[in-house]
From Swiss-Prot:
This is Egg cell-secreted protein 1.4. One of its GO terms (cellular component) is cytoplasmic vesicle. It is found in: Cytoplasmic vesicle; Secreted. The keyword Amino-acid biosynthesis does not apply. One of its GO terms (biological process) is double fertilization forming a zygote and endosperm. Keywords: Cytoplasmic vesicle, Fertilization, Secreted, Signal. Belongs to the plant egg cell-secreted peptide family. The gene is EC1.4. Restricted to female reproductive tissues, specifically accumulating in storage vesicles of the unfertilized egg cell. Residues 1-25 form the signal peptide. It comes from Arabidopsis thaliana (Mouse-ear cress). InterPro entries: EC11-15, Prolamin-like. Pfam families: Prolamin_like (PF05617). It comes from the Eukaryota. Involved in the regulation of gamete interactions during the double fertilization and to prevent multiple-pollen tube attraction; mediates the redistribution of the gamete fusogen HAP2/GCS1 to the cell surface after secretion upon sperm arrival.
Length: 127
């Protein structure tokens, strides 16, 4: 009976030492700034909220873009899409109800140098 208790005690002690060594041996990532004042002063958070607010105002343009194929997204709408997908939360558009494919189409359209114009494409020249 004493040998069973000794074996159990030794096993539990060894397990605790092994777990303690494993947990204490890994590097933890450096803490990001948890100070809310510092995050608010950085400007990034406000830029994201402003872009989200602007995106709300161009929802009709985006819906027409997907329903009718109209390529008349305004410059401010494209800037908002670009800010949200690159600087803020890449999945934010999907959380607003857009599929990942639609978010990629919007991002691709807005990153195109000719996007954001409301003017139609020039007609081809006849030679």
């Amino acid at each position: 009976m004493a040998s069973n208790t000794t074996f159990l005690f030794s096993t539990v002690t060894l397990l605790i030492i092994l777990l303690n060594t494993t947990v204490s041996g890994r590097d933890l990532p450096a803490e990001s700034s948890t100070n809310i004042a510092a995050r608010l002063q950085s400007g990034g958070l406000m830029e994201c909220w402003n872009a989200l607010y602007e995106l709300k105002s161009c929802t009709n343009e985006i819906v027409l873009f997907f329903l009718n194929g109209e390529t008349k997204l305004g410059v401010s709408c494209c800037e908002s899409v670009d800010i949200i997908t690159t600087n803020c939360w890449p999945a934010m558009l999907t959380s607003l109800g857009f599929t990942p494919e639609e978010a990629n189409v919007l991002r691709g359209f807005c990153q195109n140098p000719n996007s954001g114009d409301s003017s139609p494409a020039p007609s081809p020249k006849i030679v």
